[in-house]
Amino acid sequence: IHLCGNIDYDILIEGYKDLGINFKVFTFLEQMHYAYSGSNLVVSRAGAISVSEIAYFKIPVIFVPYPYAYEHQMSNALVLKEKGCAIVIDQKEFNAGSLRFILEPLITDAEILKNMRLAFEGIPKYNAAESLVREVMPL
C-alpha cells in the first residue's frame, strides 16, 4: 500500500506497473486501520498521529521525519527508535539506494521485523481519556 496524495498518484501507478510490482496506491485513506492491519512494515513521516497509530498497531517502521517541523517529527521518531521499534533516516540521506540498504536485511531476515514488533511490548500504554475521566469525576 502506498499513500501518496494527489500530485504523485499517476506517476506512482505507472512506476509500479512498469516494475511489475503489485502495489495498491491511494491518494488518501479514511480507514487507516485497514492499511495498518495488513502491514508488516511501514515507511512513514513521524507526525504525532502517525507515530501513535503505528505504535498502537505494533508495526515495525522506517521513519523519514519531515525536516521542516521544528524537529518535532525527529523527536517523535526517536522515541520508537530508542525502544527498538523503528529505524530513522534523515530526509537528506533518504533516496532509493538508502531505502534499499535499509530494506534488504528487513526482507531477508524475518527475525529483525519480529524483534522490532516485540519491542513495542516495552512501551507503556496510556489511556488518556480514561485517566482524564478518573481525575475529573471526583471534582
Model-derived regions: residue spans:
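C-terminal "capping" alpha-helix adjacent to the active site of nucleotide-linked donor transferases
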Residues: 83, 87-90, 94-111
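A short, well-ordered alpha-helix in the C-terminal region of glycosyltransferases
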Residues: 105, 112-126
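Short hydrophobic beta-strand element within catalytic cores of glycosyltransferases
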Residues: 44, 60-70
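Acidic, glycine-centered active-site loop in nucleotide-sugar glycosyltransferases
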Residues: 57-58, 74-86
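Donor-nucleotide binding loops and adjacent catalytic segments primarily
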Residues: 1-41, 74-78, 91-99
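Conserved donor-binding/catalytic loop of nucleotide-activated donor transferases
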Residues: 37-39, 53-64, 83
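Short glycine-/small-residue-rich Rossmann-like dinucleotide-binding loops
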Residues: 5, 47, 65
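C-terminal alpha-helical cap of glycosyltransferases
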Residues: 125-139
